[in-house]
Regions:
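Conserved ATP/PPi-binding loop(s) of AMP-dependent carboxylate-activating enzymes
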Residues: 329-333, 344-378, 416
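Structural core segment of the AMP-binding/adenylate-forming
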Residues: 55-56, 83-152, 456-458
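Gly/Ser/Thr-rich phosphate-binding loop
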Residues: 238, 243-251, 261-322, 335
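Conserved beta-loop-beta connector loops within the AMP-binding
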Residues: 337-359, 395-396, 458-462, 497
């Protein structure tokens, strides 16, 4: 074996666009308003961008930051960076200049590509970091396209996704070409798949791993059409879905809640005829799932994943059985298990049916955090990735997510899982959205608090909510404090920012 020559295996995420452009060049890849691009046209634009990046000195492995909403130029820039051999560093569009600068500095990015809609943040970030900037609406438009993409190896970094920073400053999760090509392939062809002829709504932010991997890459892997919505608006989404004949939507729970509200508020707009819906990014309340399925006459297949797992690792799959309230079974080539959360330094499994920390291994697990070996060692143990989520796995392998370990509330010595309380409160007819948190309490250590956004036209009373909850939840679980608010704080991917609520209500602000 030692005498065998080393043969390099090549793989690039850019092939997710290059291959359909070669096989079905005239198929429609992207729609944005009146614009329509075929796969061949999209790939040509990406290769022009790649050629300009190479001319501007980008070398294989160089990080290139990308700050843009869901527009066609995001997609062509994304695959252009990959085609040049670069590593994409997506920057959330909701960040301010200083926040964007931190990500650019941390990733050691050599260039910043931006859309004019976020020029102010880009200009400030560039001023603080010194990186050259490029307007993606004009960059490379006159360049001679590269013939093909620069080859990379499977374990080379492809994208660095920054986590939401729930435990401090954001960390850059390194996803390799193998991670993301496999995740796109498994999402497109296994589980429930992406059927040929799919027209998908691109409403998930493409700077987020869910939008990139499940909407964009998985869709392109099966030559789907992606209809881009630059910024999510529920009423506009209904109109787009009807106009373009959208058959599939991937969304986070907040979006499903807003779509239901938009249907109720706009009876003049027909309910779109969807064939499939996918939910991820956060736990979907069963009450919302049931209402959406009844209203839109389609199933929601809820799945589970994280930035560090590329992201998809489980899904409710028809051939394995769909169950509301669960996130289904592991996807092809991925192992899921439950570990003892009280043993943080190594992996100890717990029996089926017992609560513990969800752990993952397989092709989806990331390569580590960029320039942060200590944080990497904390989560990668004995070939497993520790997710930080509490779950239960039954004998068949079906997984239920109970909550984040960091969201657990300990009231008077009893563990209370906020998701269980939220599921109960979402059954109240006057509740549109709810976040349950723990706040400091002198007697019990922590007290249960529900922060509620009422349904349109509902007049909620905190005492009434407490009394209603008391009849449906154990004495240690029902909220003793209720706040009625106009909206919940949302992060760039539209997840509820519970850390902000804890800070606000723990300090009495």
């Amino acid at each position: 074996m030692s005498d065998m020559p080393y043969v390099s295996t090549t793989l690039s995420l850019a092939s997710v666009l290059a291959e359909p452009a070669r096989r079905e060049p005239d198929a429609i890849a992207l729609v944005q308003g009146e614009q329509r691009l075929t796969y061949a046209e999209t790939w040509q634009r990406a290769r022009r961008t790649a050629a300009q990046l190479v001319a501007d000195g980008v070398q294989p492995g160089d990080r290139v930051a990308l700050l843009a909403p869901n527009v066609i130029e995001f997609v062509t820039s994304y695959y252009g960076i990959l085609a040049a051999g670069g590593v994409v560093v997506p920057i959330p569009t909701l960040l301010q200049g200083r926040e964007a600068a931190y990500l650019i500095d941390t990733a050691e990015a050599s260039h910043l590509m931006y859309h004019p809609a976020v020029a102010a943040a880009a200009t400030k970030a560039a001023g603080m970091t010194g990186v050259p900037t490029h307007d993606i609406t004009t960059y490379g438009t006159d360049a001679e396209p590269l013939t093909t993409f620069v080859t990379r190896e499977p374990l080379d970094p492809a994208v660095i996704f920054f986590t939401s920073g729930t435990t401090g400053r954001p960390k850059g999760a390194i996803l390799t070409h193998l991670n993301l090509v496999m995740n796109a392939t498994v999402s497109a062809f296994d589980g429930n798949g992406v059927p040929p002829g799919t027209i998908a709504l691109g409403c998930l932010p493409l700077f987020h791993v869910f939008g990139q991997s499940v909407s964009l890459n998985a869709g392109f892997r099966h030559t789907a059409t992606l209809v881009l919505q630059p910024r999510f608006d529920a009423r506009e989404a209904l109109e787009i879905m009807n106009r373009e004949g959208v058959t599939m939507i991937c969304a986070v729970p907040t979006m499903y809640i807003q779509l239901l509200a938009a249907v109720a508020e706009n009876p003049d707009i027909p309910v779109p005829q969807l064939e499939d819906a996918v939910s991820g990014g956060a736990s979907l309340p069963v009450a919302v799932l049931e209402r959406f399925e009844a209203t839109f006459s389609t199933k929601i297949h809820e799945g589970y994943g994280l930035s560090e797992t590329s992201p998809s690792i489980t899904s409710n799959q028809e051939q394995l059985g769909v169950e509301a309230g669960s996130v289904g079974h592991s996807l092809w080539g991925i192992d899921i298990a439950i570990a003892d959360v009280t043993v943080p330094d190594h992996i100890e499994f717990v029996p089926a049916g017992e609560r513990g920390e969800v752990i993952v291994r397989g092709h989806a697990v990331f390569a580590g955090y960029w320039n942060n070996e200590a944080a990497t060692r904390e989560v990668l143990q004995d070939s497993w990735f520790r997710t930080g989520d509490i779950g239960i796995q039954d004998e068949s392998g079906r997984l239920r997510i109970v909550d984040r370990t960091k969201d657990l509330v300990i009231r008077g010595g009893y563990n209370v899982y906020p998701r269980e309380v939220e599921e109960a409160l979402m059954r109240h007819e006057g509740v549109d959205q709810v976040a349950v948190i723990g706040v400091p309490d002198e007697q019990y250590g922590e007290e249960i608090m529900a922060v509620i956004v009422p349904s349109e036209g509902a007049r909620l009373d905190g005492d009434e909510i407490i009394a209603w909850s008391r009849e449906r939840l154990g004495s240690h679980k029902y909220p003793r404090r209720v706040e009625i608010v106009g909206e919940l704080p949302l992060g760039p991917s539209m997840k509820v920012l519970k850390r902000e609520l804890r800070t606000q209500y723990s300090t009495g602000e």
